[in-house]
Amino acid sequence: MKSFTKILFSTLLLLAPIFSCKKSDVNKNFPTVPVNITIYLTTYPYTQLNSIGNHAYVSNAGYRGIVIYRKSLDEFAAFDRGCPYDPTATGSLLEADGSGLAMTDAKCGSKFSLYDGTVINGPATAPMKSY
């Protein structure tokens, strides 16, 4: 009986971390706007998207503009430039940092991965809004 209790306790102890993990919070307060854009990789400023790892901004789309990131030869990521921490804050706008691998909001200090939009650091807990 003691052996069974030990096994049960050990199993529960090992499974606890698995079930306690949660996905990043999704910002349900981020404004939802329709997006329907076409870009041409032969037209400036989108020509920089011909190289993997580069990004380009699209003005007048999304809530605060969109950043497009070239992940691979046939895969792109598109995110809103509004900071998920407080998307309606005046002056809040995500800008690419010097590495070109992350976006930072100068107002709140949150930093996000351009590859997948996840939070790197800062007060934000929700990832960048993806399109």
What role is predicted for each listed range?
Residues S24-S99, S113-L114, K129-Y131:
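N-terminal pre-ligand scaffold of iron-sulfur
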Residues G109-Y131:
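Short Fe-S-cluster ligation motifs
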Residues D74, K107-C108:
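Short loop/turn microsegments at loop-to-beta-strand junctions
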Residues M1-C21:
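Sec-dependent bacterial lipoprotein signal peptides
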Residues C83, T104-D105:
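Short cysteine-rich clusters marking metal-coordination/redox-active sites
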